[in-house]
Amino acid sequence: MQQLVADFFHTQAGKALLNSQKQIKIEAPETNVVGEQRLFIHSAEKAIVNSQGMIELRGEQGTSEFNQAFSYQKTVEEKAKRCVVYFKRSENYNGEYGFDWFHLGKQEDMSKGDYKFVDTIGHHYETDNDGKKVTCTDGNAAYKYPFEVLSTQIDKKRNSFEYFNIGFKLAKARIGVTPLEDFTYYIPRMTMMPDTEINLVAEIELDREENKPKEIKLQFDKADNLKLSHTTLPVRAGKVTLTISCTGELTEKRTLTAVTDDGDTVGTLFILPNSKEHQRDIKVVFVKVKTKLDGQKEKTGIVIPESITLFLNVLHQALVNVDEGVKEVEINCTEKEFAENFRYLKGIEYGIDESKAQLLQEYVMKKMVATFNTTYKCYYTVFFFGDKCFTDEGRLNGYAYQNSTYGVFFDGYNSATVPHEMLHAMGLPHSFDYQGVPFAYKYHTTDNIMDYSHHLPNPIERMSLFYWQWGILNNKIV
């Protein structure tokens, strides 16, 4: 809509709201914004005051600067007045598609790796000489330090989602029946590779029996290359398994909505574009290394099939495609020179000496060139040893260098070790490391592949990535 006023425009109301999901522009040779009692300017990300001339700041009673932001709750559209449909990962989810949502920590899902963002987003901190809390700078050891929730980061996380208010829950929240945090519907976002089929769960919650709708329909805003197993949902509380098939490339974001018979939107899911323009292609080779550290018994590294599956699944969450799949080759390091340079005797057992890590990388990379020439020059090269890796304090199952194309794994690694370490190589820090990233999370609370949740007495299976991590791995993600 375009409206032109030639002379004077005046609008007046007891309360007024200008709201846009995209952009609002106010332009004039002179603009005055007045808050007679209070003027508040807020940004969840970055606020810029820009002048090509001069900036003046005036305060009759002084000016102050603080490094702590106020919280701000923006005005949100109200929908879902009679029921709500939440889209969730399937019960047997194994990381095969990306799914990012605002965690509210439903109690029945806690043991499966769910949790509350309001208890989990913040930083592990040290105390400086002045007694102030400062974020840990050692990303590998941060988990050993105390954790503190950061409310500004939680607000930032909320604002990273599109959301609306759940009408019937908001009404109950206003009279204290429903917790305040439960009436906001944060729209989840997901990724899936072309020519794949995935399972989701639609969880239906109803208001009073007399207020329930007659019908709940499921529909895409644009159905090209997408198929859905259900076009309607039962009008009863409970869970329904849905199957979404992606039969080709998606060149733009798609929206799945649940709509009642009166046109009320009661659930929404965003599916991000997955066309070649939005994918990142890499090449990967897994190298099994044959050794003879004691001079007698040969050992060859083993590639656990589940490690390949999980590695590919996690990459696919970020729309990272391994061109032609993971290659597997073998190199021979049974020569005496290798054993003498890299073995470490612990008790009666020989293993690889971790302190020789840099020399080990140089040695095996030269061996790759000697064996295969330059065939694997532009590959992520991942080595597997049949030997343990010993340190003075204990042992390592594997490691990779940040922002590199190299990783190495030893006897004792598990299926999650490979994607965890190789995503370090691709630029991801630990999930509890709050340095140079938008968010950090309390140690061992998530099923994120970059967490240390396997340290728990009852380990949480690590298999997922957050939306912001997708963007680090693949800058073509939208």
Predicted regions and their residues:
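The catalytic-center signature of Zn2+-dependent metalloproteases
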Residues: 256, 404-478
